[in-house]
């Protein structure tokens, strides 16, 4: 169904790895950029990585960042789920990647891009537990 579509997934939590898995299940070529520090998410037995290619990069390293950009520029879509500003700090925000004007940039954040809750210094779970609807 999605054969020939290339998607880059930036390793993260929440809906992003699920979306990447679904895209891969539907035939897309999904490449996950894992953290080089061997995070818990880059476990080779992680079911969410089924059908995906992967590469470990340190996006704070200029050489690795250039490799990531080359992969992204050859892709049809990018998906990520970081807090607002994180990808921009890496130089990988939507405005930074306009070298590929056809790139579909998918953001899947818990609070959207403009919600005041994302500025909370506490972890997301603690923020969620303070909300009346989750008590």
Where are the regions a protein language model picked out?
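N-terminal helix-loop segment corresponding to the beta1-alpha1 unit
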Residues: 1-120
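Single conserved hydrophobic/aromatic residue that forms the stacking wall/gate
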Residues: 118-121, 125-135
């Amino acid at each position: 169904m999605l054969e020939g579509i290339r998607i880059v997934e930036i390793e993260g939590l929440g809906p992003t790895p699920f979306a990447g898995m679904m895209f891969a299940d539907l035939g897309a070529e999904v490449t996950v950029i894992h953290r080089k520090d061997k995070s818990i998410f880059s476990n080779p037995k992680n079911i969410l990585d089924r059908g995906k290619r992967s590469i470990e990069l340190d996006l704070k390293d200029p050489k690795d960042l250039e490799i990531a950009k080359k992969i992204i520029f050859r892709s049809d879509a990018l998906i990520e789920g970081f807090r607002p500003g994180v990808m921009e700090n890496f130089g990988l925000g939507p405005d930074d990647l306009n070298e590929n004007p056809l790139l579909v940039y998918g953001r899947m954040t818990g609070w959207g891009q403009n919600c005041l809750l994302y500025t909370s210094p506490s972890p997301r779970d603690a923020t969620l537990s303070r909300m009346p609807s989750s008590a």
